[in-house]
Amino acid sequence: MPKYYCEYCDIYLTHSSPVGRRQHVQGRKHISAKIEYFQNLLREEGITPQNFLGFLGPRALNNILGNPMMNNMMPGNFPMHMKHNNMKHHSHYSRRSHRHHMPHGRYGRERHGHYSYSSKYHSHPMHMNSSSMSSMSGFPYNEHSGNFFSLSNSMHGNGKMGNMVIRDLVSNVNIENDLVKDNPNEERNGDSAIANQPSTMHHEEDQDDPANATGGTANNNDNVSINA
């Protein structure tokens, strides 16, 4: 004889195992019989949805509100298994949307290559070495040019500071070139002055020579002595 009796369905279960009872409780016939049982009970007691809370009284109302299972069944709340299912569906949806927005193989690599191309050739235009840049710029590689290119590499050749450094470098190079151009002229002027000094000295000696200066008088004296 079966051990389990269902008072809602008014039957004895042929399988009284936990699995059999769980299947019976979750069945459609048991649920409909349970609803009908409580409807008949409320009708016999004269309980309607309007006077349901007043019929239970304040103590029963407090028990209902204090019961966590009843709180979960209140409007706006859901049982724990429904919450769990909703969270699972939400997580699956978010994962699908995340995969949808992720870049796919070939397009992702192309975008990455495009970004690397722009960062390599546009954001850092001064990655060439300073010696090659100095040979291209037209002035020899020196201390000032090396400092300039190190500064320009640090600033990536952008902004007003880079332009100011370029202007300062050009002005320094022009000043050095002017000094180099002026120094040979000064040396040549000094050489010409030194070369001209002996010539002027010889000219003065010729003018101050007593023999040359009295040459005319000596001849005149000779002539005078001869005439006498």
From Swiss-Prot:
Highest taxon, organism lineage: Eukaryota
UniProt-listed Pfam families: zf-U1
Gene Ontology molecular function: mRNA binding; pre-mRNA 5'-splice site binding; U1 snRNA binding; zinc ion binding
Any GO CC annotation of this UniProt entry: commitment complex
Zinc finger (Matrin-type): 4-36
Compartments where located: Nucleus
Keywords, in A-Z order: Metal-binding, Nucleus, Ribonucleoprotein, RNA-binding, Zinc, Zinc-finger
Gene Ontology biological process terms from the UniProt entry: mRNA 5'-splice site recognition; spliceosomal snRNP assembly
Compositionally biased intervals (Basic and acidic residues): 179-190
Function according to Swiss-Prot or TrEMBL: Component of the spliceosomal U1 snRNP, which is essential for recognition of the pre-mRNA 5' splice-site and the subsequent assembly of the spliceosome. U1-C is directly involved in initial 5' splice-site recognition for both constitutive and regulated alternative splicing. The interaction with the 5' splice-site seems to precede base-pairing between the pre-mRNA and the U1 snRNA. Stimulates commitment or early (E) complex formation by stabilizing the base pairing of the 5' end of the U1 snRNA and the 5' splice-site region.
Family assignment from sequence similarity: Belongs to the U1 small nuclear ribonucleoprotein C family.
Protein name per its UniProtKB record: U1 small nuclear ribonucleoprotein C
Organism annotation: Plasmodium knowlesi (strain H)
